[in-house]
Structures are given as structure tokens and as C-alpha cells.
Amino acid sequence: MKENNHTTQQNTFELLAPAGSLAIFKAVVAAGADAVYVGGSKFGARAYADNFSDEELLEALDYAHLYGRRVYLTVNTLLKNSEIEQVCAYLQPFYEHGLDAVLVQDFGVLTAIHERFPDLAIHTSTQMTVTGVEAARLFSGYGVTRMVMARELSLNEMKRIREETGMELEAFVHGALCYCYSGQCLFSSMLGGRSGNRGRCAQPCRLPYAVLDEKHREYKKDAYVLSLKDMCGIKDLRGLADAGVYSLKIEGRMKQIPYAAGVVSYYRKYIDLFLSGQETQVSEGDYRAVLALGNRCGFTDGYYHRHNGSDMVTFTKPNYEKTNEALQQQILRTYENGAAKIPVRGELVLHQGQAAYYRVKTQTVSVEISGMEVMQAQKKPLLAEDVKSRMEKTGDTPFVMEELSIKIEDGVFLPNGALNQLRREALAELQKEMLKPYQRQEHPQRKAEKKFPEACEKREKRKERVFAVTGERRQLAPVLESSCVTSVCLDMEAYDRSTIMEELKEDANAVMQKDKEVYLAMPRIFRAGTAEWVRQILPDIKRMGFAGVLVRNYEELALAKETFWGSEIITDHNLYCYNDQAVRAFAGQGVTKNTVPLELNRSEIKRRYNEESMMMLYGYYPLMTSAQCVHANTRGCDKKRGLSYLKDRYQVQFPVKNFCTYCYNVVYNSLPVLLFSNLEEFKKAGIRDFRMDFTMESAKETKAILKLYEEFADGSRRQYPKEWENRYTNGHYKRGVE
């Protein structure tokens, strides 16, 4: 197969455009996209886009390759056990047809594709929340050739990843910004069952919320505090090049031709100017034109030069401002018919008694076709002008005849049908030859399917354990007094940077003095500043007697393999193990225990391999983790860890904690999940480790919850007390997501 790739060097860019339909696909190619990312009939993160049928996707592959462009297919959702078995069969025809790369979120999907198609390029989706060099090194062994950076990364962070790993980088340059780190959002999922991890986000972040302080006093009314402006990076080409970013990604698979092709055309203009060394100052007129194609309360340059900021937030109703109808119509007329046809040259030779000869060529490919034998004319001989007129026709092919040479012996004849057939066969053969280098004829050897993770099968079966994760130090005392808790997980979020080492040591010793195992829960997001500091302190923390670590992202997984190898490495629920393939893949990375994803329902959990899984029985689900800060954006940053609330239009209040040590916000569900009454069901499903997550609870509340668990665990209680009525949720256990 032809390597339809590129040389990743500074000052070289790929302009990557979205397309939600074949018509938009052809338009963005015409507008100058180097590559196009599309969703097929299954497994894409834009379930409500038109998307491509299998036949349309095959046509798109041919169309792109004829013009020397690339196609990336999105398989960037989380797949359940019932679905992952289909993914390789789904990809097979596109793989054989020359698919350039596949974009993935699910670690199980990633490893399954790499095992089945080892020569297919894999790009990690922004849904994998890649923020550091550690993840790049981890993924490099799985066929990953490119990482789509989390939108929150600065240009300096991207530069460091590129320089330290050599991994090809893709960054968003234009379009909508999510409030939450992509892949970490359960807001839409928990409120209405429409999961962003399944391509069905309902965007509750675009709704108004009142902001309340820690004592539930309202201080900001009906503000769009979770709604970010659209980003535009057209003025940052120099910075992106200096950072080593190769692929510039435009968001918008739900957009139509005027927006998609229009935005591509303006970026194409300034990329070409930049690459040619000319002046790249974006004119005010062009910037206004891009703005007029669509924006949400104006533009922001995103996180390239900042960690967060109130100027990125709309605060007012995030409607798109009025667009320029005349400009949109002009773009539609220019690009709706697709790219200009490919110029070809032809040579036709007609000699009596010999087979008709026709040669057609582009700049790089040439084909020769022989037709029927040329006859002596009985009546009207062929005229060069008539033959030329007929042979120059290219119809609905992608070609246009640029030059045609005709050599006709006097007095010869060939039926018009024979000439037409010669022309059609030649152009069809030319197209076939142009596409042949991209296609894969070989069929990779299928690997034997492994029903369960072999790395797990070899492990000694452990007794049941009950973990308590303490998000505040005040919760530790009742946890230590609980007879049911066997293991305590001290969350790094509960400690300030200045005192963490002393307080962690004190708390770890207190846990071990109670003959309980002590574990460390690492931060939810692991950016460069955090990584440098944590790398320094982690060996000392390990020596405090920690039995293992709870990791929440791929960067921490890679780091834990270095520091905690030989100890327990537990992945949190947001390192998603929707399917057994993911369980096996993580086990291969040294993971000893995974947390059951929060979006699986009862039947899906039962069909899952659970022998090495932990189930969260109690806790406030984190709905969003954001680099933004509700407190800082509404009251100013005071660098103090605290609690506030968001109140929606139904008067429901969602707690928000700001973690200043790591500079991120976590928005929690309004009610905690409570699954104590289902304990025996989980045991029958093979789960032996259970967990309670404490976030904002007081010591008294923590003690009451632990007592309630003990009563269910010893069989003395079968129903929840009346005072718990309407104070908890079952999460997705009884409903699940689409």
C-alpha cells in the first residue's frame, strides 16, 4: 500500500477538516483540506450527524486519494462487550480500500485494531484526555502514530511533548470548545442518558445556571458559566509551528458546507502564505469573514496562551451571532460541486488493420488500452475533429482532458461505440491505477480471541475488600473506625501542596496502625506542572508504606509503572473498561484492578469480566473536570480550595469543588449514587472489591454512610431508611446509556 503520509517537520502543516456528509467532504477537499475526518455508520462521536454509509465512505476514500488527500475514520466512542466484537469486521473493507488512519478513544478498541490491523495508523482522540509526555510513550507501542491533544494544553506544553517524544501532534484550531476535558464528561449522560462517550451529548453546558457559595447563597443569577466561546487559531500559525504541531484540526462535523468549506478556505490561504514565508498577518476583513461564518459570542484563542480565564466564557446566552448570508452563498457556489477535475493528456493512434491504441496519463500515472481492430472505411471515414470531440468527453469521471494527440490514418473507420468504450475503459483504468497504491490486498492474520485477560487469569484470587476514598481529611477518622473498611485511599486532592508530604505521612501511618491497607489516589488531570512536582515526591510517598495507587489518566498509569511496579495499580472509572478487551489491555500495562465504568447498567455489568474489577457503591459522580474555575471566573482567583454550587432551571444544585493545587474544577452530581442494596448482585457478577468515595461529606455524614453499608453487608438491613428517600440515585445501574 502507498504510504499516503508526509514528513513531519517544523513549518509543515496538515489542514484537517470535518465532514458530516459526502457533499461536505467534497466541498472541504475543494476548499483545500489536506485530510478529512469522518464518521461512518457505527461507533463515531457524532451520532446525530448525517455520517457516511459504508458505500459513501468507500467513495470518499477514492475521491480523497485521487486528489492526494487523506481520510481518517472516527471510532472514538466507548464500546460495550456486545459491540467490540464487530469493530474489526466493520473496519475491514475500509482498511482494504486504503483508510489512512482511525481515530479512537477506547483503549480496548485501540489494542484490538492494532492486533488485527498492525499496519493501520491509529490516532488517539482528544477523548482520551492526553496531556503529557508519559501518555505518548505509553501509546507508541500500540501503533499510535499521532495524538490529538487535549484542547486545554498550551503551546508550550505541546512543544515539550513533541520535543521529548517525537510523536506527531494534532491540535484543534477552530470551532466549539467544551467546558470539560473531553472524555471526562458525564453531565449529559447522568441528566438524560445521552452520553458524550457514546457520541450523544445533549450539551447541558450551554444552559444557564445560578452560582451559589458554600452556604448555598446565590450570588450570580442565570449565567452561562459553563458555556465557552468558539476558538479561532488562525492568528497562531507561527506559535503552532514553533510548538511542533503538525495537524491543524477544525471542529464541526455537524456543520454544513458554507461553514466547513468557508473556514477551510481561509485557513488554507494563511497556511499557504505562512509556508511560503510570506506575510501572514490576518487581515481584518478576513477575520471578520471567518467570524461571520459562525461564532458563539465572538472568538477566543483557546488555551494556547493561558490556563483558563473568564474572557473565554460567554456568560450570556450562547447563540451564534448573525451570519453573512451573501458570503455563505458565495462559498456554496464555489465549493458545492467539489474539487476541480484532474487534468489528463491523451494519445490516440488509429491505423488500419491494427488494434486501436489509446494512452491516457496524469503527471504521475499512465495507462494504455487496446481496442478493436481499425477497419478500412466503406463509406464515411473518420475525421480527426469528430474523433477529438468524442474522445475529449470525460463525463462524470474525476478527469478533464487537458491535451489530446490524435494520429489517424486516412480512410479508416471505427464505430462510435468502439471509440466510446475505448475512452471509458482508459479513464476507468487510469482511476484504478491511481488508487491501486493506496489499497491493501493482504488480509492480516487474525489473532485468536482471548475471552478473558490472560494477565488476570494468572493472578491469585483475593478476598473481598472494601475501599474508602477520602476526599477531605475530616473523613479519615470515621473511616478508620469502621470495621468494614479494609483499604483506605488517600486522595491527593485533599491536601495542599505546601503540607502534603507531612500530612500524607501522618494519615498513612494512621491507616496502617489500624491494620488497613493504604493507597494513594492521584489527581484527575496530570499536566506538565503537576508532573514535574509529583515525579519528585512520588518515590518518597511510595516509601511511606502505600500498598498501591489509584490512577486517573494515562500519564499517571505510565508513571505508576515506574514508581509503583510490583505494587497494586488500580485504574479509576474514567480510564474506561467498558469491554473485556480494555480490561486485558490495561492488565498488560501492569494494572491489577480496574473500576467498573459508571455508565454501564446491570445487564452490561453481568456480561463483563469482573474478577479484577472494583465497584463504586457510594459517592457523588464527577460530572465534569475542567481547567476553568467557576469560583475564579465569577469572583476572582484567591487560590483557596473551596466549594460552590450551580443551580439549574429546575432548582437542582450541583456541587463544584475547585482544586487549586492542580488548577481544575470538578462539578459533581446533585445526589450521590447509593448501591448498597445491590451488593449481592455484584458479588454474583464476580466483583470482590467495593468502594465508597467521600467528597464533601462531614465526619458525621461519613460515619452514617459507613454504618449504613455495614448493615447491608451483614444482612441486618435490606431497605434504605426513610430519611434517605429522594436523597440518592442509582446512577446508570438500572438504565444505562444509549
Where are these predicted regions, by residue range?
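A short acidic, glycine-rich active-site loop
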Residues: 49
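Glycine-rich, highly charged phosphate/nucleotide-binding loops
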Residues: 52-57
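Ser/Thr-centric signal marking residues that sit
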Residues: 125-129
